[in-house]
Structures are given as C-alpha cells and as structure tokens.
Amino acid sequence: MSVASTAAPFHTTSGSSGAISTFSVVDYVVFGLLLVLSLVIGLYHACRGWGHHTVGELLMADRKMGCLPVALSLLATFQSAVAILGAPAEIFRFGTQYWFLGCSYFLGLLIPAHIFIPVFYRLHLTSAYEYLELRFNKAVRICGTVTFIFQMVIYMGVALYAPSLALNAVTGFDLWLSVLALGIVCNIYTALGGLKAVIWTDVFQTLVMFLGQLVVIIVGAARVGGLGHVWNVTSQHGLISGINLDPDPFVRHTFWTLAFGGVFMMLSLYGVNQAQVQRYLSSHSERAAVLSCYAVFPCQQVALCMSCLIGLVMFAYYNMYSMSPELKQAAPDQLVLYFVMDLLKDMPGLPGLFVACLFSGSLSTISSAFNSLATVTMEDLIQPWFPQLTETRAIMLSRGLAFAYGLVCLGMAYISSHLGSVLQAALSIFGMVGGPLLGLFCLGLFFPCANPLGAIVGLLTGLTMAFWIGIGSIVSRMSSAVAPPPLNGSSSFLPANVTVAAVTTVMPSTLSKPTGLQHFYSLSYLWYSAHNSTTVIVVGLIVSLLTGGMRGRSLNPGTIYPVLPKLLALLPLSCQKRLCWRSHSQDIPVIPNLFPEKMRNGVLQDSTDKERMAEDGLVHQPCSPTYVVQETSL
C-alpha cells in the first residue's frame, strides 16, 4: 500500500550528477533477471493451452486459483514501489508512530473476508461493478466503472514514473530506459497471459520485494552493531514513538488516525477495488477466497515491519557515519535509495537486488491495473452493448484492451514527467476516489432503502467533497513557505550528521496555526476515505428517503448483507415499513425463486449455475420471501 507516499513530493532533477554510486555490470544483470523472469512466467501461461483459452481464463484465471498465490498477489498489488520508498523515509523523519497503521489491518481485512467476499462471490461476478447494476441499475454501474477507470489510469502512470525518476536521480540509471523496459515487459505478460500470469508473477515479485528489503536490514544492522544497537540509538534520540491518543482528526498521525482512519483506507483497497475483488473471485472456492484475505494480514504486518526497520536502520547508520551532501539535500522519495547505494556500494549485485525489489513493486501494481482495467472495460462497457460477441473475438478484444491500457500507462508516465509539483496531486487522486466508491458499495450492501437516484447523487457529492478537500489541502501546503521541523519542532533526535533540511515534513504547512478553510484542509489524509465514504452514505440515504426509497422497485435479495435485518428487527413494525425493509414491507416485490441475474454475453445463468449458487450459501427460506447470505464458516 502506498499510503505513506501519497504526499511525498518528487524531485525532478534528472541525470547522475548527484549520484552516490552507479550500477555495476552485476547490478544490471540482477535487475535484468527480474524483467526476464517476469516475462518468462507471463509467456509460459500465455503459451500454455494457446488456442484453447477462454475469456474466463484470461480475465478470471478460470476461477481455479489457490489460497497462497492469491494472498501474495493481493499483497503485491498495492505494495507499490512508492510505498517501499515512502514508509522507511517516514520512520526516518518522524519516528515510529506510523507503525500503528498495522492495527488497522485487522478490521481492514476481517470485514472484506466476512462481508464483501461472501456477497460478491455468491453473485458469481466478474466485475465488482456488476454488483451495482444488480443492486441499483445500469446507470449506477457505469458511474462506478468510469470512476474506477479514472482512478487507475491516473495512478498507474505515476506508479511507473515515480520510482524510475527517483532511481535516475540517485544512481544515474537512465530514466526512460527503465520506464520503457518496465512498461513493455509488464504490457506483454499481462496482455498475453491474463490474470493467471499476473498472479504468478506477483508471487515471484513479492518474494523479490521481501528479499531485497531483508538484505538491506541485515547488512545495515550488521554494519552498525546489530538490531539491539539500532533500537538503543533510535530510542535515545526519541525516534521510538509512544501512543499518541490525541483524538483531533487534524493531527496527521495519531493512534486513532492510523488504527481507525486506516481501516477505511484498507476497506477501499481490499474491499471494493476491482483489482482485489478480481483476485478473490478467481479463487477456486469461497473458502479459499476468505483464507487468502486472512493470509494477507500476517504478510502485511511483515511488510510494514520491514519498511519500518529499514527506516530505523537508516537512522542508526547515519548516526554513526557521515551523510553525503547529496543525501542532505535529497527529496523524501530519494532518501532510501541514497541510503541503499551508500550502504551496499562495495557489494556488487546487492544494489541491483534492491532496485529489483523496488521495481517488483511497480510491476505488480501496474500489471494489476492493466488487467483490472481491461476486465471492467470488457464486462461493464463493451459486453452489455455487444451481447452476441463470440468467444474468439472477446479474447482478442480483452488482450487488445490490456495492451491499449499499457500504452496509456506509458503516455501517463510521459505526462507525469511534465507535471512537476502537480505530480503529488496526481498521486493523491487515487486516495480521493477510493472513499466515495467504498461509500457507494456500503450504501447498497447495508441499506435496502437506498435507491439508484440516491446512489448517484451520493457518489457525485462524495467525489465533489473528496476533490475539494484533497486538492484544497495540496494547494494549501504548496502555498506554505515554511515547513515545521519534524517531531513537534525538535531537531534534538537527529543524528549529528543530519540536517533539518534533509528531513523536512512530507506534508508541510505554515508554522502559524491554520484557521478557517486552511484548518479544514488540514484533515489527516488517513481520514479522507472515512469522510468521503460517510458523505456518500449520508447523502445517498437522505435522497433515497426523500424520493420514496425502494417502493415499487424489485430488490435483488442476494445484493443485501444481512446485518441490518437483525438490528432493525428490534424496531417497531411501522418504522420497518417506513424504512422499506423488505422482510416486513409488502411494497417491495420479491419473486420467490429469483436468483441474482448474471449476464454473460447476453445470456442468463442456467439452472446449473443456480444450483451452484444454492450450494454456495444463497438459500431460499420457505417461511419468508427472502434470501439469507449464510455466515462464512472456516
């Protein structure tokens, strides 16, 4: 996840003039092996069974994937290169408060495992936005799809360009050579191999990411006298943060902000994002999908701990050794690379391994974006208009879409090179859009009275609020001339060799206390998803109730998660009818034998699919015209 990176400004200097070290031949070989092996894995799955591929195999891996590869792919999808660079730099400059983000992983993965996955899996979806049509109508589905496409197109270009830019500034590694190499390799194996190739390359790239970070921790700790010494040094300098229980949502990082605001951010990524939902649905069973979500939890904790340890080791290292002039003036996204090149400069091959680790994060994120964008474009925008599309043409079109989005990614990377400081705004758009989409799905899942008009108005209002606060915050920070010193204004924690200029805040603001709109814009970025999703739900409910709710409309029973029935059953019958609760209201027609409709090339699911849906837990209760989504049991 790239949460630590969303506000990191990018240094736009190109060339090798400020490089600490350059790549050796061995480093280039190690880095090249990453690209070659990723390409080989993709081509293997593309060539295997060539001529017998189906659209389901290309987009959904034939729904036969196991728990472990899906779990590692879920982790790799948003463990981007920007996060690998951002989290250690965050710890180095501000202390270990960021580590409490790990507390949000529990609910952030438990809720998708027991709410989103059962509903999505039992509806046998391909695109997450099919749910919106089943629950509301086609217009809501298209709105959700277009919003997701906008989000991912912006982000994937930045995710490709940003690490290449940092690498170029630090090592002199050619900027556009790395951009083109990554873009072309990723494009080929994603377009030809489909989701199965993406998942298995994600597995390989996840192992490379862990290995690269582990090498830095081991070598760095050994160089300064062990992890015990690292902990002692960082503790003495005040880098080990206590629990900040300040409830103020305008404080950037507190325990509540990280542990609870982070839950909504996690839900927007692991609950409703198409890239992740697609992996859940590619599992061979619902149980495997739930287990894969569980397995992400320890993997995320390990990834977070490794990133934080790199930040602590980097601090202890520069407490013992002098910093180069380049590092003292480095942009935040370059700190880790400068440290790695300084630490491993006498060990040929290891700098190349860390760069391979860095670009593994980019490859996994970008390939997931290509594949998910091709899937939603095919399922949500093309097939509904061309229901008679043959299997052969559908396969060619799916591959063509993935390839086309790859070209768009390269184009966005080129545009990013001309954005300058606006690059930060482009990165933040990813977070701005995730919250409203989460709110839209929650509105449909938990509130049966919500209608299509309420969903659309709620989504548009949520997006408006998201961009207002997000862009306003960025503009407010950019206009600030002075940045506060880190760690509550004290520079006493810094090693003697570190200047305050080298650790200026990631989210600068003026030293004077903000007032009015500036105070409003200073809302912690980790609360963005919570604020924006709540806006969608509240506005959507108000509009729905004012326009009659779901009275007179059919409600697909498989699209509602049965949490509220148990709570609302405690209310008087008159209140339940007013809320249009279908278990007691006769205003909502429910056909007794209605199974969720799933369109596939214009054809409804047959009786075999209906039997399979019944086996998966969507069961009809004879005593009442409702369906109950059974609890997931492991």
Curated annotation (Swiss-Prot):
A single Gene Ontology CC term: brush border membrane
Gene3D superfamilies with a match to the protein in the record: Sodium/glucose cotransporter
TM region positions: 23-43, 65-85, 100-120, 142-162, 175-195, 207-227, 255-275, 295-315, 350-370, 403-423, 427-447, 455-475, 526-546
Tissues with expression: Expressed in the intestinal mucosa, liver and kidney (at protein level). Expressed in the colon.
Annotated Pfam families: SSF (PF00474)
Main localization of the protein described in the UniProt heading: membrane
Alphabetized UniProt keyword annotations: Biotin, Cell membrane, Glycoprotein, Ion transport, Membrane, Sodium, Sodium transport, Symport, Transmembrane, Transmembrane helix, Transport
Topological relation to the membrane, as annotated: Multi-pass membrane protein
Disruption phenotype: Intestine-specific knockout leads to premature lethality between the age of 6 and 10 weeks in around two-thirds of mice due to acute peritonitis. Growth retardation, decreased bone density of the femoral and humoral head, decreased bone length of the pelvic, tibial, and femoral bones, lethargic behavior, hunched back posture, and decreased biotin status are observed.
GO BP annotation list: biotin import across plasma membrane; biotin metabolic process; biotin transport; iodide transmembrane transport; pantothenate transmembrane transport; transport across blood-brain barrier
One GO MF term: biotin transmembrane transporter activity
Superkingdom of the organism of origin: Eukaryota
Reactions catalysed, as given in the entry: biotin(out) + 2 Na(+)(out) = biotin(in) + 2 Na(+)(in); (R)-pantothenate(out) + 2 Na(+)(out) = (R)-pantothenate(in) + 2 Na(+)(in); (R)-lipoate(out) + 2 Na(+)(out) = (R)-lipoate(in) + 2 Na(+)(in); iodide(out) + 2 Na(+)(out) = iodide(in) + 2 Na(+)(in)
InterPro entries referenced in this protein's UniProt entry, alphabetically: Na/Glc_symporter_sf, Na/solute_symporter, Na/solute_symporter_CS, Sodium:Solute_Symporter_SSF
Compartments where found: Cell membrane; Apical cell membrane
Residues the record marks as carrying a glycan: 488, 497
Domain observations: The C-terminal tail is important for biotin uptake as well as apical localization in polarized cells.
Family from the record: Belongs to the sodium:solute symporter (SSF) (TC 2.A.21) family.
Quaternary context: Interacts with PDZD11.
Protein purpose: Sodium-dependent multivitamin transporter that mediates the electrogenic transport of pantothenate, biotin, lipoate and iodide. Functions as a Na(+)-coupled substrate symporter where the stoichiometry of Na(+):substrate is 2:1, creating an electrochemical Na(+) gradient used as driving force for substrate uptake. Required for biotin and pantothenate uptake in the intestine across the brush border membrane. Plays a role in the maintenance of intestinal mucosa integrity, by providing the gut mucosa with biotin.
Annotated protein name in UniProt: Sodium-dependent multivitamin transporter
